Each structure stands twice: as C-alpha cells, then as structure tokens.
A protein has these predicted regions:
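C-terminal ends of transmembrane helices
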Residues: 17-27, 95-107, 150-159, 163, ...
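Structural signature of hydrophobic alpha-helical transmembrane segments
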Residues: 2-12, 80-91, 135-148, 210-223, ...
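Cytoplasmic/organellar membrane-interface segments at the starts of transmembrane helices
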Residues: 241, 374-377, 432-497
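Short helix-boundary/re-entrant hairpin motifs in multi-pass inner-membrane proteins
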Residues: 163, 215-282, 309-310
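Transmembrane helix-loop-helix hairpins at membrane boundaries of multipass inner-membrane proteins
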Residues: 1-7, 19-117, 195-199, 487-496
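Alpha-helical multi-pass transmembrane bundles of energy-transducing inner-membrane proteins
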Residues: 26, 114-121, 125-212, 223, ...
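Predominantly late transmembrane helices and immediately cytosolic-facing juxtamembrane segments
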Residues: 228, 345-351, 410, 414-452
Length: 497
C-alpha cells in the first residue's frame, strides 16, 4: 500500500469529507471522527512519502494517476519541499480538527457535519495544491481550498458572512488571473505538466505573452497569499472566521499559494532572465511595503485577532523578500518561514479561540491575569510571540537568520534594515500582550464556558495548544537539520550550477 501513499494524502480526506454528512446524520459525533481519522491517515501517508524521498537523496517521487504517464496523465510530484509541507498541513489539520470539537458540541448534526465536511475539503485543497505536478489541477485544488475556506469563514457569525463574501469577490479575481496565466502558458507550450512546462517554456521567456503570464501568477497568488497591497480580504476574514477553523485558515491557507508561487518562479520559470529579475524586484518592493505597513497596522489594533491578521501581512512580506533575493539563503529563509509561520500563527489563533470560547471576547486590554487562568495557553502565546519577534532558540529566529544571510550574500542591505525594524515593531505589539497577561491586574471577565481544571480549557483544546507551542521550540532546535536534510535536498536547479 505504501506505493500509493502520495494519492492517499488527498484521497483519504476527500472520501471522508464526502461521507461526513451521511455519518453525521446517523450519529452526530461519527462524522467528525471519520474526517479526523482520514486526516491522521493523510498525515501518516505524507510522513511515508517524506521518509522515502529523503532516503532516495531528495529524488522526487512521481505518482501517475491510473498509470497514465505525463504529459497526458495527471501526476503527483513529491520532492523534499512539498513532502515536508504536506506533513505540515496534515499535522496542523489534525490538531485543529481535534481542537474544533468543543465549538460544535452543542450544534445539531447538520451544522456539525457541514463544518467537518468543509474542514476536510480545505485539507484536500491545501494538500492537493502542494503535491500536484499539473498546473490545471493546481487550479482545481485552489478552488477547492477557496470554496471550503469561504464556507468556514461564513460560519463564524456576526460579520463573518460579509467577510466571506468580500473574500469570495477578491479571491475569484485571484483564481481567474491564475487560470488566465495557465491559458497563456498552454498557448505558448501546449502542455500543463509542470516538469514538461519547465522545458518547453524556455524559448518563450523573452516574449510579451510570457511576461503577461508571470504578472497573472504574481497577482493571482498574491491575492491568495494576502501579499500587500492585495491583502484587503484578510483582516476581516481572520477576525470573523469560525473560531475553531481560524487557526487552520490563518496558519495554512496563505502558505500553499506562497509555495505555489515559489514553485512557479524557481522550478518552472527559473529566475535567470530579465523578465524574472523584474518580477523578483516587484516581489521585493511589495514585500518591504507589506512588512512595514503590516507591522504598523498591527500596532494600532486592540482586537487580538485583527492584530494577528495585520501581523500576517508582514510575515508574508518576509516570504516575498526571501523569494526576491534570488539566492540560496533567501530561498531557504522563505521556505523555512513558511513552515515556521504556519506553526506560530496557528498557535496564536488556537489560544485566541480558547480565550473566546471561555470568556466570549479577545480584547487585547482585557487579558490581565490570563497566566493564572489559562497557564498552558499563556506559555504558548509567549513562545509564539518570542518566535514572531525572532528571538533564539525559537523557530522564528532561524528563518529570519537565513533571510539576513540572503540579504548579506546578495549585498541587499536594505532588506537587513527592514528585517531589523520589523522585529522591533513586532516586539512592541507582542510584548504588549505579554505585559497584559503577566503584569496587569486581573481583568473582570465573564466566563461563558467556565472551566475549573488546571488546563483552563477542555482537554481536546488544551492538547493542540500545548503540542503547537512545543512545536515552535522543536522547529527551532532542529532548524539546522530541516535545512540540511530537507530544504537543501530540494533546492532549485539555478542554485546547483
């Protein structure tokens, strides 16, 4: 069965999602457990793939649907980078699926089944985008990710329907631009397979049609990954999304498009042409603007979730400037920050959801005494905040370190200045949270769901928060191994010459 591990990453959660409503109708609790079991299976399949790819020295595992060879057949192409990202997405999905149970505990079977159906489909879309070797199938998975994301955001109540509708309008533009870019490439090359496309597109790299296609991909993926100034949908979407799913949406939903953009820029188009140099310069400018403006906007917020939404705009800027540097260290920093930020932001949103579940609000200035009421959550927030600032030995330090090395190697010293300023701004608004939790007088919060235990939350919520907090340290301690044994095995050809 291990020879089919690549397809199981997508097939298991897809099958469970399609059956979830039926099982939930039979017994309300059955549907969620079916979806969670399928995600565990997808996670184990992703681990199997990663282990085999590393054992083969980084050689990609090509899986052909039905035995049909590309470019005619549909292919999953798993290399060290997308294999580790598949492990990341399925692991976070597994944690958040368990975490979500108390939020839907009192709902009827229809709402419970609907929630976990959308959750499973979001996992399918994210994993499919990461592992597919076909540009049109990437569009299919992009739409699955987007549609399920719209649904999960709309379940949040209050202003969530408006936030989801705004994301729908803007996201549709992004998906349409991506599809338009695919059409241009197909017109030039006559193929949709990524590996075949990388060979056939070379003679057309200097043409106007190719430049238009590149612009379509940058804008299309830029919208999906909330790259400044294309991030307008994100603050409301993160703020008003269903609290159970917000951690998954914030942690992973912008990372799959970011990786897809890296894949196009470095593996299909290469980066050693005037057109691509111009594209990288644009990414760098947008990344710098996003880092500075996102950080400043985050400082002005009093709602914890909205602050983190603007913080994500800045963090996506880090990934953008890593891509824009055009050297090995910048590339490593960008990929490593995709992994690290997924853990950091997911951890913070898990805690926010826990605070909202227990107290019904997440005002930054009403967190006083939280260290006594929710100890595990407070520790996780502290670790995540230190990592976002970039202090060792947390994960965030190492991705910023590689970005600094990339800027130094490329003599792009203005990137170093931006990273330093951004870290100082991060320190201002994250230490504000730490001060509220540890120093300020205990806030008089009304407990919506009182919890008397030491964990401060139900076990199914406290466990993922604890695991994700530990994960931030583990990623920090093993960052050198991740870079050496995984990321460097999957470096694009341009860095191996």
């Amino acid at each position: 069965m291990t020879q089919h591990a690549p397809i199981f990453i997508v097939l298991l959660p897809l099958t469970a999602s399609l059956l979830c409503m039926l099982f939930s109708r039979i017994k309300k609790e059955l549907g969620p457990w079916i979806v969670m079991a399928s995600i565990v299976g997808a996670f184990l399949s992703a681990c199997t793939v990663l282990q085999r790819v590393i054992a083969n020295g980084g050689k990609a595992w090509h899986y052909w649907m039905g035995g049909w060879q590309p470019p005619i057949g549909i292919e999953f192409a798993l290399d060290p980078l997308n294999s580790v990202l598949a492990v990341l997405v399925t692991f976070i999905s597994m944690m958040v699926a368990l975490y979500s149970k108390p939020f839907v505990k009192e709902e009827d079977w229809l709402h419970v089944g609907g929630y976990y159906t959308l959750f499973g489909l979001l996992t399918v879309g994210l994993c499919g985008m990461i592992v597919t070797g076909d540009v049109f199938n990437l569009y299919v998975y992009l739409e699955i990710m987007s549609l399920s994301g719209y649904g999960l955001i709309s379940l949040g109540g209050k202003k969530s329907m408006l936030a989801a509708f705004r994301y729908l309008l803007i996201g549709t533009i992004g998906a349409s631009l991506y599809l338009l870019g695919v059409g241009y490439l197909y017109a030039l090359t006559g193929t949709l397979n990524m590996a075949d496309l990388a060979q056939r597109v070379v003679p057309f790299i200097g043409t106007p049609l190719f430049a238009i296609a590149v612009a379509c991909f940058i804008i299309g993926f830029g919208i999906k990954m909330a790259l400044f100034p294309l991030h307008g949908w994100q603050p409301d979407a993160y703020t008003f999304a269903h609290p159970g799913a917000a951690a998954f949406i914030a942690g992973c939903m912008s990372k799959a498009p970011a990786y897809a953009l890296i894949r196009f820029m470095y593996y299909i188009f290469k980066v050693d042409s005037p057109v691509m140099h111009s594209a990288l310069n644009v990414l760098g400018i947008l990344g710098i603007a996003g880092i500075l403006i996102g950080s400043i906007m985050a400082m002005a917020q009093y709602d914890f979730r909205r602050m983190l939404a603007y913080s994500s705009v800045a963090q996506i800027g880090y990934i953008a400037i890593g891509m824009a540097m055009g050297n090995m260290y910048g590339f490593i920093g960008a990929v490593l920050h995709i992994i690290n930020h997924a853990f950091m932001k997911c951890s913070l949103f898990l805690v926010i959801g826990g605070v909202e579940h227990r107290f019904g609000e997440v005002n930054l200035y009403r967190l006083g005494g939280l260290n006594k009421k929710m100890t595990i959550s407070t520790i996780t927030v502290t670790l995540a905040a230190l990592s976002m600032i970039g202090l060792p030995p947390t994960a965030g330090f190492f991705s910023k370190w590689y970005l600094m090395m990339g800027a130094y190697t490329g003599q792009q010293y203005f990137y170093i200045a931006v990273l330093v300023v951004s870290s100082l701004l991060n320190a201002i608004y994250f230490f504000r949270i730490i001060e509220q939790m540890f120093v300020q007088r205990e806030a008089s919060l009304t407990e919506v769901h009182p919890h008397k235990g030491k964990l401060g939350l139900p076990f199914s919520m406290a466990l993922p928060i604890f695991v994700m907090g530990i994960g931030i340290l583990v990623l920090g301690f093993y960052s050198v191994d991740i870079v050496t044994d995984i990321i460097k095995l999957g470096l694009p050809e341009v860095f191996l010459r």
